[in-house]
Each structure stands twice: as C-alpha cells, then as structure tokens.
C-alpha cells in the first residue's frame, strides 16, 4: 500500500457520507495535485487535498506549497473552496484537521 492511502481512504469515506457517492470524484492527475473534487447539482463546490504526517503538526515542503498554489489558482478560476485535510498522529490515534489552502500559501498566490 502506498504512503497516504489510508488517510485518503478515510477522507473519501467521510466525503461520501457528507456529499453522496456520485458527488465525490477521486482525481488521479499528477500535474493538478488535488485528491478529490466535490460536486453539488452539477457545480464544483470544493477541492480537497489530503496530507498525512506521523507528527502532531504538518508543514508543507516547497514542492507541496507549489502544489497548493496550483490548487488555489484552480479554485479561484472555478469559484469553489479549496481545503487541505491533514491527518496527524496524537498519542497513536489519527486526528483530522481541516484548513483552507490559502492559509498555507499566504500572500504567495
């Protein structure tokens, strides 16, 4: 199993529960960078990127910041939300933190 798959699987289950199976699309395009697109009544409403770490806090690497910039730009074009779902470990348990992509790219967009 590849790194991060468990976090993506957990995230997909939560998104399907919230938005319905037909409205959650797994994206497999490397150059774009996001993991999931969320639709509602034929309109794109959210772009979700999933990140995982074995530490308590996740800090994006320069390559990941560039990926987040692309996601943010895409979300601006399509007028939708862009979120990072961050799975961290706390005392052996996985915890989820949901943040706006904009928080991590600051004024760099």
Question: What role is predicted for each listed range?
Answer:
Residues 22-23, 45, 80:
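A structural micro-motif
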Residues 72, 77-109:
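Domain-level recognition of nuclease-like catalytic cores that cleave nucleotide substrates
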Residues 30-33, 92:
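Short acidic/glycine-enriched loop/turn segments that link adjacent beta-strands
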Residues 15, 36-38, 43-54:
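Conserved catalytic cores of phosphodiester-cleaving nucleases, focusing on short active-site segments
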Residues 53-81:
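Short, charged, amphipathic alpha-helix that recurs within catalytic cores of restriction-modification
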Residues 1-27:
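Acidic-basic catalytic patches of nuclease active cores, encompassing PD-(D/E)XK
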Residues 26, 49, 84-86:
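Structural signal for conserved beta-strand scaffold positions within catalytic alpha/beta enzyme cores
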Residues 26-30, 37-41, 76:
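Short secondary-structure boundary/capping segments within folded domains
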């Amino acid at each position: 199993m590849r790194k991060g798959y468990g976090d993506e699987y957990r995230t997909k289950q939560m998104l399907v529960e919230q938005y319905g199976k037909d409205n959650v699309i797994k994206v497999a395009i490397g150059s774009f960078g996001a993991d999931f697109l969320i639709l509602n009544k034929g309109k794109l409403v959210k772009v979700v990127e999933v990140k995982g770490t074995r530490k308590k806090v996740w800090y994006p690497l320069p390559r990941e910041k560039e990926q987040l910039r692309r996601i943010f730009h895409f979300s601006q074009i399509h007028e939708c939300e862009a979120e990072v779902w961050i799975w961290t470990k706390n005392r052996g348990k996985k915890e989820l933190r949901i943040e706006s992509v904009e928080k991590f790219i600051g004024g760099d967009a």
